[in-house]
Amino acid sequence: MDFILLIFLSGVFLPNIFSLQPTVEQDPGVTISDDQYYDEEENNTDENSAIFQKLEDNGGDTPANEKTGNYYKDIKQYVFTTPDSKGTKTEVSVTATTDLKFTMKDYKSSKATASGEEDKRSEPSRKSSTPNVPAFWTMLAKAINETAVSMDDKDLFYQAIPASDLNSTNEDQLSELEEIKLKLMLGISLMTLILLIPLLIFCFATLYKLRHLRDKTCESQYSVNPELATLSYFHPSEGSNQTVLTEESSFLPPEESGKVVIIESNTVNEAEVTEERISE
């Protein structure tokens, strides 16, 4: 990269550098004295002084002569400035020694620097307007007066968070979610009603049946038939009971099968007596 830069700069600035050197057209038969040579060199340097700026000799950077150990005394340093389309200028400094050193500097034009100086001067005037008042009260006063407040980096923590960072969902999406929730609640309530109504009906039916069975048991325990009561009542004045057998018996002979057989007994059950009376 240094070699390419050197070639580029040499192609741009070498014509001007060569103009510094004395150009003498010598005829083959003409000889120039030393005085004329130095006079022409001084004239050339005076003509190019408007383009190039001379700087002080830099003795520390000058190389030494290895044979004699002395430094070169005739050392000159030239600075080249070239403007760019962006409004900046590049500086190239050349030292006229055996070692050529190129240094480039970029800096803005004088207009830009002047505007920068004005901005720097205006900033401390704003800060020094209220040096003794706390920052909170100045901010409060500016907020009341509806003036713009210059916030520092530390004050950015107290600013409100924008709504886009908090929630990225739209109102339409929120309304759709609410509708889904309502539908779920209605579905759950309908399912509970469908399950509870048959359960309640079954409970009422079982209770009614149990009550009806209890009433039947009470009636069967205390019911009295008056006919059976009169028939089952024992009368001692009648004497011994007689049972009449009217049924035909296979054990009797056929001659006596149609007769009535009377069986006398002192002890007869009440059930047999009732049956005989009913048959009469």
From Swiss-Prot:
Q: Where in the cell is it found?
A: Cytoplasmic vesicle, Secretory vesicle, Acrosome membrane; Cytoplasmic vesicle, Secretory vesicle, Acrosome inner membrane; Cytoplasmic vesicle, Secretory vesicle, Acrosome outer membrane
Q: Membrane-spanning regions, if any?
A: 184-204
* Processing and modification events after translation: Highly N- and O-glycosylated; contains sialic acid.
Biased composition range(s): Basic and acidic residues: 117-126
Keyword list, A-Z: Cytoplasmic vesicle, Glycoprotein, Membrane, Phosphoprotein, Signal, Transmembrane, Transmembrane helix
Q: In which tissues is it expressed?
A: Highly expressed in testis and epididymis. Low expression in other tissues.
Tree of life domain: Eukaryota
**GO terms for CC?**
cytoplasm; early endosome; inner acrosomal membrane; nucleus; outer acrosomal membrane; plasma membrane
One short Pfam family name for this protein?
Afaf
The segments annotated as topological domain Cytoplasmic are: 205-280
Spell out which residues lie on the membrane's Vesicular side. Answer: 20-183
Quaternary structure annotation from Swiss-Prot or TrEMBL: Interacts with SNAP25.
What this protein is called in its record is Equatorin
Tell me what organism the protein belongs to.
Rattus norvegicus (Rat)
